[in-house]
Swiss-Prot record:
SUPFAM superfamilies: YggX-like. GO terms for cellular component: cytosol. The keyword Iron applies. Could be a mediator in iron transactions between iron acquisition and iron-requiring processes, such as synthesis and/or repair of Fe-S clusters in biosynthetic enzymes. This is Probable Fe(2+)-trafficking protein. Gene3D superfamilies: Fe(II) trafficking protein YggX.
Length: 90
């Protein structure tokens, strides 16, 4: 296991990312506070948002929306769930 971080999303000490996954200050905060496991959770959530909202990633508005959701997912009150989303029962 490489470097560890106290993961802000999962609330425990876990393996950290190998490099900042996003540019700028937000990428630095993610690198310092988010585990690989939590980042994988964001990738799944981001994929759901892109698919459900048919986001075009070449559109600046779509990229801005995803950046806002990324910040909310880790450092805010949580990212938005698509309209009508019902999580699978466990």
């Amino acid at each position: 296991m490489g470097r560890t971080v106290n993961c802000i999303k999962l609330g425990r000490e876990l393996e950290g990312l190998d490099f900042p996954p996003y540019p700028g200050e937000l990428g630095k905060r993610i690198f310092e506070n988010v585990s690989k496991e939590a980042w994988a959770g964001w990738i799944r959530h981001q994929t759901m948002l892109v698919n459900e909202y048919h986001l075009n990633l070449s559109d600046i508005k779509a990229r801005k929306y995803l950046a806002e959701q990324l910040d909310a997912y880790f450092f805010g009150s949580g990212a938005e769930q698509p309209r009508g989303y019902v999580p699978l029962a466990k």
